[in-house]
Amino acid sequence: MMFWRIFRLELRVAFRHSAEIANPLWFFLIVITLFPLSIGPEPQLLARIAPGIIWVAALLSSLLALERLFRDDLQDGSLEQLMLLPLPLPAVVLAKVMAHWMVTGLPLLILSPLVAMLLGMDVYGWQVMALTLLLGTPTLGFLGAPGVALTVGLKRGGVLLSILVLPLTIPLLIFATAAMDAASMHLPVDGYLAILGALLAGTATLSPFATAAALRISIQ
């Protein structure tokens, strides 16, 4: 099926640029590490501010990685070829965003036990953090994809991309950190996780169409 061929191709291309994959991950880890060094190793304080630290770091690292979502395709001319495929352009966008999450969002999940240890979180807090990252990091990709498509042809589109995308991430940031706060106090988190799941379902449904329209505008 052409969808999965595009997905596998995107993964292969991403792994050829391993440095661009590693940079956001290093940024995420460095930001997480700086907080215990700057405010001290007090476990209660670190656990209290951990939700905000983790999600701001995840948001900023995802913005670093988002810029290359369509940039390489535009530079080598393959973006126009993707638009001519018999597969609908929203499906192509969906495959690209999924592959992008596999190489940028999934590693954050793998690093989550280390992050929990650095910030003094308990096992339940780590489990909820991992769930928020599982639901929230692909949502970040879907929220950012239309902005990337609109700015892909600009030489210095990074600042404009941040201005476009950051306001859209505020609800995600609120509910993800609220879920982790509730977990730290051993309160129910099902409602917060349900909202995060709804945000993921909504963005995964609507974002490919908005991104496809933005790509057509940028190419023209």
Curated annotation (Swiss-Prot):
Give the record's GO biological process terms.
cytochrome c biosynthetic process; cytochrome complex assembly; heme import across plasma membrane
Show which residues sit on the Cytoplasmic side of the membrane. Answer: 1-20, 66-100, 149-158, 214-220
Instruction: Give the way it sits in the membrane.
Output: Multi-pass membrane protein
Give an example GO cellular component term for this record. ATP-binding cassette (ABC) transporter complex
**So where does this one cross the membrane?**
21-41, 45-65, 101-121, 128-148, 159-179, 193-213
InterPro entries recorded for this chain? Cyt_c_biogenesis_CcmB (IPR003544), Cyt_c_CcmB_bac (IPR026031)
| Entries under Pfam families matching the protein | CcmB
Question: In the record, what terms sit under GO molecular function?
Answer: heme transmembrane transporter activity
Residues in compartment: Periplasmic:
42-44, 122-127, 180-192
> Which key words are in the record?
Cell inner membrane, Cell membrane, Cytochrome c-type biogenesis, Membrane, Transmembrane, Transmembrane helix, Transport
Where in the cell does this protein reside?
Answer: Cell inner membrane
From the record, what ranges are coiled-coil?
Answer: none
Q: What is its main location?
A: membrane
Give the similarity note: Belongs to the CcmB/CycW/HelB family.
Stated role = Required for the export of heme to the periplasm for the biogenesis of c-type cytochromes.
Write down what this protein is called: Heme exporter protein B
